[in-house]
Design a protein with these regions (language model features):
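Interfacial transmembrane-helix termini
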Residues: 19-38, 63-85, 95-104, 112-135, ...
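Transmembrane alpha-helical segments and their membrane-water interfaces
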Residues: 42-48, 84-165, 206, 252-253, ...
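Long extracytoplasmic/lumenal interhelical loops at the membrane interface
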Residues: 290-349
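Helix-loop-helix junctions and helix-breaking kinks within/between transmembrane helices
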Residues: 24-33, 70-79, 120-130, 186-194, ...
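Alpha-helical transmembrane segments of multi-pass inner-membrane proteins
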Residues: 112-115, 145-176, 187-254
Length: 418
């Protein structure tokens, strides 16, 4: 069987698996455990046996939909299961992986450091440790020349499209009200919004810079941008909307297209915004933007308490941190998240951990220093994760989709660099 025919069959197969995943829409009960195990095996075995380079995009797509989708999913919630899958798969197929990627040395150091601090200081491995280890091993499944690059972009586009459809079809009937403004969601709308924003930015880059391999891909990208932008407005997450907006501005301003086309794109976006505003899509977002709460829904109070707890620690703790588990319970009875990745890294992993985090963020910039064609997309995606980390803690919280998004940024920078 030719490689082209094999991949076509695998695409059809995984499209069917997506339909099965999305067909379970109960928000209160998961499928029976035997059925979930069979589904998981059916999901990973074809990729492992026939196309190992597809395993990572498949896991990234299905774990995101399982986490942020409307229902209790076929996909397990325990991250150690995915670490086991990736580790066993790598052991089985390593000899078949020719000219594969390697994780950045600085990322390896960061991963070892974080896991060590959590194990020694927190006395347990937590979600961030499992997510880091999963991504570290995932690099080995990726080719150096990037022939599967479109699969990774398509992964985040599919995530955005399906989550958008969930939002518009089931959003009102199955949502849980989370604010007095009427904003509704079945998961945290801030994390949900940023995950959808990832696909919007990638799709927008495909459309503006004409990177689609065929016209069908381009049409899907256009649909993604349209659906995703409308979702982000109606989802009313200020942070997610800001992250997406900044990234899109960077892509537009620094894209390769002519000035006349950039002006046309800006006018088209402006018309879209006016249309959505006229239809009332901006109502909840506008109300939240005009909110006079100077604490950012209590975020500054949390930051102050956590920072005070950090300053009360000894020098060793300030340098190397206290681990995620102890940081979660620091200063606030019952425990509470930081709502800021930078503060979370500082408290949980010390000054050393925060510096290492900035180093892994800066790594893709180093790769594109001499690659002007890839600078806009890499800078825009880095700006996206840096902004969303200001009011959330997706990375210290161990959100696997966000770590896979970081991995994609590295790959986009590397594929151009090599």
């Amino acid at each position: 069987m030719s490689e082209r025919r094999l991949y076509r069959r695998l695409y059809i197969y995984y499209f069917f698996m997506l339909i099965v995943l999305c067909s379970w829409v109960s928000p209160t009960s998961a499928p029976p455990m035997p059925l979930r195990l069979v589904y998981l095996l059916a999901l990973v075995l074809p990729a492992i046996l026939k196309a190992p380079n597809m395993l990572v995009p498949v896991l990234a797509c299905f774990t995101a939909l399982g986490t942020y989708g409307i229902s209790c999913s076929y996909m397990p919630t325990e991250k150690w299961i995915y670490l086991l899958i990736v580790a066993v798969s790598l052991f089985l197929v390593f000899s078949r992986l020719k000219s594969c990627q390697r994780p950045p040395i600085i990322f390896v150091v960061f991963c070892i450091y974080v896991c060590f601090i959590d194990f020694i200081r927190g006395e347990e491995l937590v979600d961030i440790d499992y997510s880091l280890l999963i991504v570290l091993l995932s690099f080995f499944f990726v080719s150096k020349n990037g022939y599967e690059k479109d699969n990774y972009t398509l992964t985040f586009i599919i995530i955005t499209v399906i989550l958008s459809l969930f939002f518009f079809i089931y959003g009102q009937s199955s949502a849980v009200e989370v604010s007095e403004t009427g904003r509704r969601s079945w998961v945290d709308p801030n994390y949900f919004g940023n995950v959808c924003g990832m696909g919007v930015v990638l799709a927008y880059n495909v459309v503006v810079n004409k990177l689609a391999p065929n016209r069908y891909f381009n049409k899907i990208a256009i649909i993604t941008v349209t659906l995703g932008m409308l979702l982000l407005v109606m989802n009313a997450s200020r942070g997610a909307f800001l992250s997406m907006s900044v990234a899109i501005v960077v892509v537009t301003v620094f894209s390769k297209v002519k000035l006349k086309k950039k002006i046309g794109i800006a006018l088209l976006v402006a018309l879209g915004v006016i249309a959505m505003y006229s239809l009332g899509a901006f109502d909840v977002l506008t109300e939240r933007l005009m909110d006079e709460d100077i604490t950012g829904n209590g975020r500054t109070i949390i930051w102050g308490a956590k920072m005070q707890g950090y300053m009360n620690g000894d020098t060793f703790e300030k340098l190397f941190g206290i681990g995620y588990s102890k940081g979660f319970y620091l200063a606030i009875p019952g425990g509470f998240g930081f709502h800021n990745d930078y503060l979370a890294f500082l408290v949980d992993y010390g000054v050393v951990g925060l510096i290492l985090f900035f180093c892994i963020v800066a790594y893709p910039l180093k790769l594109v220093a001499n690659s002007p064609s890839k600078r806009p997309i890499v800078i825009s995606l880095l700006a996206f994760i840096l902004i969303c980390s200001m009011t959330l803690e997706p990375f210290t919280y161990g959100r696997l989709t966000y770590w896979y998004f970081y991995m994609l940024i590295v790959l986009l920078a590397r594929w151009d660099h090599t």
